[in-house]
Swiss-Prot record:
GTP binds at G44, P45, Q46, S47, S48, G49, K50, S51. It is an enzyme of class 3 (hydrolase). It comes from Arabidopsis thaliana. Residues 760-781 have a biased composition (Polar residues). The gene is RHD3. GO terms for molecular function: GTP binding; GTPase activity. It is found in: Endoplasmic reticulum membrane; Golgi apparatus membrane. Residues 34-249 form the GB1/RHD3-type G domain. It comes from the Eukaryota. Highly expressed in fiber and xylem cells. Expressed in roots, cotyledons, seedling hypocotyls, stems, pedicel, stigmatic papillae cells and anthers. GO terms for biological process: actin cytoskeleton organization; cell tip growth; endoplasmic reticulum to Golgi vesicle-mediated transport; plant-type cell wall biogenesis; root epidermal cell differentiation. Its EC number is 3.6.5.-. This is Protein ROOT HAIR DEFECTIVE 3.
Length: 802
C-alpha cells in the first residue's frame, strides 16, 4: 500500500476533491493527530524540480517530470501526501508551477488562488528557485514572490508563516554571500507590494520567518544533493515544537477539521473574498464543534444505559439515579472534550455548554419523574406513619410534626441522591409541593378526626339525654324541668370535659377550641329542645294517657271498679288537673331556670272556667289565651302557643267526655244490679194487697216453717246456680245456662239431704251443727262464687282511646 497516499486535493479547474480528501484523512489517520501535525507546501516555477525535491525530502511519490520527453507541466492543481517517517504527522502539498505556458501569461488567477490557499493552510512554505536568478531584476521568482506578498495582505493571519527559500543548483558562490543578496531582493519586493494603511510600515518579519537553504544540482551532483536533502529533512522532525520550523501554532485548526477547513478556505478564495483566518478558524471550530456536539447528543440518546435508566424511572424511583445519570452525562461530555479539545476555546466552551444544556433539557423530564416518585413515596410513607402513630394513641399534633419531619428528611435525602453533578436544578418547588400535600392531608385528617370526636360525643349525648328527657317529660310535674336542667348540666359537663381532653393533642387555637366546646354544649341543649318539641307534638296523646291513668286507677295503681261509692266528679277533676299540669309543662322550654305563670294562666282560663255560667273574670282570662306568645317567654322557647293550648284542651275534653260518661253509666248499672228490693210503691202495694195472706201465716205457724224450709232451699239453689252472675251476661244466655245447671244442682242438693237424713239419732245435735256449718260453708262458697261472678258486672269497661 502507498504509505504517502498521494491524492489530488484540487484539480486544475479549481474543483475541491471532497471524497478524495476524506479518504486521504482516513488512510493516514490524520483525524487522530489533534494539533500535532504540520502542513508543508511548495511553490515555484514550472518544471523547477518541486516534485522531485518533495519526493526526496519527504519520501512522497508525486509525479516527476520526464526530462527525456521535454519540459512541460507535470503537476496540475494541488496534490497532497503524507511524509513518510517524520514525526509528528507532516502533510505535504505540491502546488502547480507558476509561469507555465499551459495557462498563459494572462491566466494568473489560479496561481494567486493556490498561493493564497497554500499560505492559509501551510505552516511551512517552500519556495523553489534557481540559484542564477538571485540578484537579477527580471528573475523568474519575482512574480512568485509578488504573488505571495500580495495575497498575504488578504489573510489577516495571526501567526507567522515560515518561508523557506530553497536555492537549487547552487554554484561555487558560498551561501553566506548569496543569502544577503536574496534577502535584499525579498525586501525590495516586499516594499514594492501595495499594503493596507494599517500595514504600511509593518516589516516583513512580522509576517514571515525567512529561512534560506541551498542544494546542489540533482542531475550533476546527485549524491551531494541527496546528502544535503537528508540534512534538510532532519529539520522537519518535531517541527511543531517551540522553536521548530512550524512553532507558531496560533492559527492551527485540529486535524479532524482539516478537510472542512481546507474546503471552506478554498471556497472563500474562489469567491475572491478576503480570507480572515481568525474568523475562519472560529467558523471551522463552530461547525466542527456543532457536529461533534450533535454526534454526542445522538450517541447519548442511543446509549443503552440511558435508555435502561429512563425506562426504570417510569415504573418507580431508581436508587442512585443522580450518580448513574451523572456518569452517563460526563462520559458524553468527556467524549466531546476529547474530540473538540484543539478547537477555539471560546467556541469549544460555548458548544459544550450548549450540548450540556441540550442533554440536561433531555433528561430533565426524567429527573422530574424521579422527583415525582420521591414526592409520592414520601407522601404515602407519611400517610402510613401518621395513621400508625394515631392508632398507637400518640397525640395528633406531635404525630403529624414528627412524621412530617421524618418523611421530608427522607425526601431531601432522596433528592440529594437524584441531583446530577452537571445541573443545579432546584428541588425546592417539589419540596414545597410535598409540604403542601402533607399539610393538606394533615388538615383533612384533622377535620375527619375532629368530626369523629364531635360525632362520638354527640352520640353519647343523644344516648344520655334523649331517653331520660323523654321519660321526664312523660311524667311531667313541677320537678320535670329542674330535673332536665340538672341532667343537661351534668351530661353536658361530662361531654365537654371529655372532648376538651381529646382536643388537647390537636394544639388548636383557643378560639377554635372554645367554639367546638360551645357547639357541643349547644348540641346538648338542642337535643333537649328537639326532644321537647317531639313530645309537645304528642301532647294530646300524653294528656289522654295521663287522664286515663289517673281516672281508671286508684291510688294503689289498681284498676278502678265503679261500685257506686266513688266520687266521679272529684276523680274527673283530679285527672283533668293532672293533664292540665302536663300541658303547662310541655308548653314552653325551661332550660334557663326562668319563672313563668303558664300553669296559673291555663288553670284560670281552662280549668276553673267551666260551663256556661262563667264570670266576666273567667272570660277575661280565657281571652288572654287568644295569643301566639306567652307572657315573659321568648317565642323561640314556645312549644305550644296559648291558642294551641286552648284548642288542645277543648279537644281533650271532648275526647275524654266519653270515658267519664261510661264511668257514670257503669256506676248506675252497678247500683241497679246490687239493689234487689222492689220500688217503694211496690212494697206498699204488697203490704196492702198481701195483708190477708200475712195474717193467714200468723194464724197457722206451720206455713212459716214450710216457708222457712223453702227459703233455705231457694237460697241454696241461688248460691249454687249463681243466678245473679249468670244474668249479668244477659237474660237469654242466663236462662240457657241455668237450664243446663238446674237439674244437676237439685239432684246434688237432694242427695246431701238424704245423706243427712240417714245419719244416727245420737248425732242429731252434731248433724244439726254439721248442717248449719254446711249451710254456712255453702253460703260462703256461694258468696265467693257470687263475688267472683259479679266482678265483671261491676267493672264497667272505659274507652281511654277516645
Amino acid at each position: 500500500m502507498d504509505a504517502a497516499c498521494s491524492t489530488q486535493l484540487i484539480d486544475g479547474d479549481g474543483v475541491f476533491n471532497v471524497s478524495g480528501v476524506d479518504h486521504f484523512i482516513k488512510e493516514v489517520k490524520l483525524d487522530e493527530c489533534g494539533l500535532s501535525y504540520a502542513v508543508v507546501s511548495i511553490m515555484g516555477p514550472q518544471s523547477s524540480g518541486k516534485s522531485t525535491l518533495l519526493n526526496h525530502l519527504f519520501g512522497t511519490n508525486f509525479r516527476e517530470m520526464d526530462a527525456f520527453r521535454g519540459r512541460s507541466q507535470t503537476t496540475k492543481g494541488i496534490w497532497i501526501a503524507r511524509c513518510a517517517g517524520i514525526e509528528p504527522c507532516t502533510v505535504v502539498m505540491d502546488l502547480e508551477g507558476t509561469d507555465g505556458r499551459e495557462r498563459g501569461e494572462d491566466d494568473t488567477a489560479f496561481e494567486k488562488q493556490s498561493a493564497l490557499f497554500a499560505l492559509a493552510v501551510s505552516d511551512i512554505v517552500l519556495i523553489n528557485m534557481w540559484c542564477h536568478d538571485i540578484g537579477r531584476e527580471q528573475a523568474a521568482n519575482k512574480p512568485l514572490l509578488k504573488t505571495v506578498f500580495q495575497v498575504m495582505m488578504r489573510l489577516f493571519s495571526p501567526r507567522k508563516t515560515t518561508l523557506m527559500f530553497v536555492i537549487r543548483d547552487k554554484t561555487r558562490t558560498p551561501l553566506e554571500n548569496l543569502e544577503p543578496v536574496l534577502r535584499e531582493d525579498i525586501q525590495k519586493i516586499w516594499d514594492s507590494v501595495p499594503k493596507p494603511q494599517a500595514h504600511k510600515e509593518t516589516p516583513l518579519s512580522d509576517f514571515f520567518n525567512v529561512e534560506v537553504v541551498a542544494l546542489s544540482s540533482y542531475e550533476e551532483k546527485e549524491e551531494q544533493f541527496k546528502e544535503q536533502v537528508y540534512n534538510l529533512r532532519q529539520r522537519f522532525f518535531q517541527s511543531v515544537a517551540p522553536g521548530g520550523l512550524a512553532g507558531d501554532r496560533r492559527g492551527v485548526v485540529p486535524a479532524n477539521a482539516f478537510a472542512f477547513s481546507a474546503k471552506q478556505m478554498w471556497q472563500v478564495i474562489k469567491d475572491n473574498k478576503d480570507l480572515d483566518l481568525p474568523a475562519h478558524k472560529v467558523m471551522v471550530a463552530t461547525v466542527r464543534c456543532e457536529e461533534i456536539a450533535n454526534e454526542k447528543f445522538s450517541s447519548f440518546i442511543a446509549n443503552e444505559n440511558w435508555r435502561e435508566l429512563e425506562e426504570a424511572v417510569q415504573s418507580g424511583p431508581v436508587s442512585g439515579f443522580g450518580r448513574k445519570l451523572s456518569s452517563i452525562l460526563q462520559a458524553s461530555l468527556s467524549e466531546y472534550d476529547t474530540e473538540a479539545t484543539y478547537f477555539e476555546e471560546s467556541v469549544r466552551s460555548s458548544k459544550r455548554q450548549q450540548l450540556q444544556e441540550k442533554l440536561l433539557q433531555l433528561v430533565q423530564p426524567t429527573f422530574q419523574d424521579v422527583l415525582g416518585h420521591l414526592r409520592a413515596g414520601a407522601l404515602e410513607n407519611f400517610k402510613n406513619a401518621f395513621e400508625k402513630a394515631l392508632d398507637a394513641g400518640e397525640g395528633f399534633s406531635s404525630s403529624a410534626k414528627s412524621c412530617a419531619q421524618s418523611c421530608i428528611s427522607k425526601f431531601d435525602k432522596g433528592c440529594e441522591e437524584a441531583v446530577i453533578e452537571q445541573a443545579k436544578w432546584d428541588t425546592s418547588k417539589t419540596r414545597e409541593k410535598l409540604e403542601r400535600d402533607i399539610e393538606a392531608h394533615i388538615s383533612s385528617v384533622r377535620t375527619a378526626k375532629l368530626a369523629e370526636l364531635t360525632t362520638l360525643y354527640e352520640s353519647k349525648l343523644n344516648v344520655a339525654l334523649s331517653g331520660p328527657v323523654e321519660a321526664l317529660l312523660d311524667g311531667a310535674n313541677d320537678e320535670t324541668w329542674p330535673a332536665i336542667r340538672k341532667l343537661l348540666r351534668r351530661e353536658g359537663e361530662l361531654a365537654v370535659y371529655g372532648l376538651s381532653n381529646a382536643l388537647s393533642g390537636f394544639e388548636m387555637d383557643e378560639e377554635t377550641r372554645s367554639k367546638m366546646l360551645a357547639d357541643l354544649e349547644n348540641y346538648a341543649r338542642g337535643i333537649v329542645e328537639t326532644k321537647a318539641k317531639e313530645e309537645a307534638g304528642r301532647a294530646m296523646m300524653r294528656m289522654k294517657d295521663r287522664f286515663a291513668t289517673i281516672f281508671s286507677h286508684d291510688s294503689d295503681s289498681m284498676p278502678r271498679v265503679w261500685t257506686g261509692k266513688e266520687d266521679i266528679r272529684a276523680i274527673t277533676k283530679m285527672a283533668r288537673s293532672a293533664s292540665l299540669k302536663l300541658l303547662s309543662v310541655m308548653a314552653v322550654i325551661r332550660l334557663d331556670d326562668e319563672l313563668d305563670n303558664i300553669e296559673k294562666t291555663l288553670t284560670l282560663a281552662l280549668f276553673n272556667s267551666t260551663g256556661n255560667n262563667a264570670t266576666s273574670k273567667s272570660i277575661s282570662t280565657i281571652d288572654s289565651l287568644a295569643s301566639s306568645t306567652w307572657e315573659k317567654v321568648a317565642p323561640e322557647k314556645t312549644l305550644i302557643t296559648p291558642v294551641q293550648c286552648k284548642s288542645l284542651w277543648r279537644q281533650f275534653k271532648n275526647e275524654t267526655e266519653y270515658t267519664v260518661t261510661q264511668a257514670i253509666s257503669a256506676q248506675e248499672a252497678n247500683r241497679r244490679n246490687n239493689n234487689w228490693l222492689p220500688p217503694p210503691w211496690a212494697i206498699l202495694a204488697l203490704v196492702v194487697l198481701g195483708f190477708n195472706e200475712f195474717m193467714t201465716l200468723l194464724r197457722n205457724p206451720l206455713w212459716l216453717l214450710v216457708l222457712f224450709v223453702g227459703y233455705l232451699v231457694s237460697k241454696a239453689l241461688w248460691v249454687q246456680l249463681n243466678i245473679s252472675g249468670e244474668f249479668q251476661n244477659g237474660v237469654l244466655p242466663g236462662l240457657l245456662s241455668l237450664s243446663t245447671k238446674f237439674i244437676p244442682t237439685v239432684m246434688n242438693l237432694l242427695k246431701k239431704l238424704a245423706e243427712e237424713g240417714q245419719a244416727p239419732p245420737t248425732n242429731s245435735n252434731q248433724s244439726m251443727n254439721s248442717t248449719a256449718q254446711s249451710e254456712v260453708t255453702t253460703n260462703g262458697e256461694s258468696s265467693s262464687s257470687s263475688s267472683s261472678g259479679s266482678s265483671p258486672a261491676k267493672n264497667v269497661p272505659i274507652d281511654t282511646s277516645a
